[in-house]
Curated annotation (Swiss-Prot):
This protein's UniProt keywords: Ribonucleoprotein, Ribosomal protein
Protein family according to the UniProt entry: Belongs to the bacterial ribosomal protein bS16 family.
Gene that encodes the chain: rpsP
PANTHER family referenced in this protein's UniProt entry, alphabetically: 30S RIBOSOMAL PROTEIN S16 (PTHR12919), SMALL RIBOSOMAL SUBUNIT PROTEIN BS16M (PTHR12919:SF20)
Biological process according to GO: translation
Protein's organism: Staphylococcus haemolyticus (strain JCSC1435)
Name under which the protein is recorded: Small ribosomal subunit protein bS16
Keyword Ribosomal protein part of the UniProt annotation: yes
Transmembrane parts of this sequence: none
Classification lineage: Bacteria, Bacillati, Bacillota, Bacilli, Bacillales
Amino acid sequence: MAVKIRLTRLGSKRNPFYRIVVADARSPRDGRIIEQIGTYNPASVNAPEVKIDEELALKWLKDGAKPTDTVHNILSKQGILKTFDEQKHAK
């Protein structure tokens, strides 16, 4: 089963709010999820607001989940991918 870390859209028209979730790659964007690992609010007043459970994100990356391009950018800005690479090369 191919697993992806991706965004599911919530919120109203022109006011998006996203959950960062782990889901089967074949399921629809807002369909069945395996686990929610964070949130992303691009419409925040000052800057985009991101909250991610770092332990869950690292667990799913270690288990082989592939982040989408947007989630990859979010994870790299949060420093989670750097931590993942350090853990991977430390072994």
